[in-house]
Amino acid sequence: MTKAGSKGGNLRDKLDGNELDLSLSDLNEVPVKELAALPKATILDLSCNKLTTLPSDFCGLTHLVKLDLSKNKLQQLPADFGRLVNLQHLDLLNNKLVTLPVSFAQLKNLKWLDLKDNPLDPVLAKVAGDCLDEKQCKQCANKVLQHMKAVQADQERERQRRLEVEREAEKKREAKQRAKEAQERELRKREKAEEKERRRKEYDALKAAKREQEKKPKKEANQAPKSKSGSRPRKPPPRKHTRSWAVLKLLLLLLLFGVAGGLVACRVTELQQQPLCTSVNTIYDNAVQGLRRHEILQWVLQTDSQQ
């Protein structure tokens, strides 16, 4: 790859006043660093070389006023070509350019432009015109600048439109996200309320069960004294025992009446001399003496007296 330094020595040797001629130098690339070191070189001739592209840092040579890039093989200019704001004269004759960068509209000082012999886009070619003389090249510069400004404005509007679309899409996404978050909050709130209600019911059920447990001992305690005090005599066996004793007492009473009647007959009537009454009187006397000492009779008499 050929550079100016290897073909023609130091670039300063080629500097003539403010003009640096690097034409016909068989250059494949531009020595940007060396050119940046020569800010006095406001006129730069790079025509008739083998340049296919310009490096992006070439746009930092803002001191350039006149630039000749004719008869190279340039297919496009750097996107930041508009940074060369001091450029007044630009020759792009006989290259392979189809379009110009939008930043070209920033070359507000451009007065002269030649775009002949490039495979330009039809619209751009019509705007540029033929550029056959000085006047037409000046008109070319003016018309191309106006055209590129219009292209820039269109692109800016399109950019703004896309930004607006993106903003609207972002708003929709944010609104959707907010709605989703609100829905999730509402769901969590509902679940929390349901959980709270469930815990409340469990708590109420637990309290009710506890109250029931507390009532049972009280009920049993209330029932126990009544049973002991006899206010509610609900003892079937005692009733059966009482009825049995009543029958027994009745039989004993009848027996006593019968015996008493017989005893009376044997003791106070004329029958007491009869052998049977004599035996009865003897048995009676013995029975009375024994019964007086017997505990059963005392218990019967005591029970009878209590009732």
From Swiss-Prot:
Q: Which InterPro entries match?
A: Leu-rich_rpt, Leu-rich_rpt_typical-subtyp, LRR_dom_sf, LRR_domain-containing
Ranges in the topological domain labelled Lumenal: 266-307
Please note every region of biased composition (Basic and acidic residues): 154-221
Task: Describe where the LRR repeats fall, as residue ranges on this chain.
Answer: 10-31, 40-62, 63-84, 86-107, 109-128
A biological process term (GO) from this entry: intracellular signal transduction
Q: Which residues carry this modification: N6-succinyllysine?
A: 73
Keywords (A to Z) from UniProt: Acetylation, Coiled coil, Endoplasmic reticulum, Leucine-rich repeat, Membrane, Microsome, Nucleus, Phosphoprotein, Repeat, Signal-anchor, Transmembrane, Transmembrane helix
**Compositionally biased intervals (Basic residues):** 229-241
Q: According to its UniProt record, in which tissues is this protein expressed?
A: Widely expressed.
- Please give the residue positions where the record annotates the modification N-acetylmethionine: 1
Modified-residue entries (N6-acetyllysine), positions: 135
Record bears the keyword DNA repair = no
State any GO CC term: cytoplasm
**Residues with N-acetylthreonine modification:** 2
Region span, Disordered: 150-241
The chain's Cytoplasmic topological domains, given as residue ranges, are 1-244
PROSITE patterns from the UniProt entry: LRR
Q: Where in the cell is it found?
A: Microsome membrane; Endoplasmic reticulum membrane; Nucleus envelope
**Gene Ontology molecular functions:** cadherin binding; RNA binding
How does the record describe its quaternary structure?
A: Can form homodimers. Interacts with SGO1. Interacts with FGF1.
Protein name, per record = Leucine-rich repeat-containing protein 59
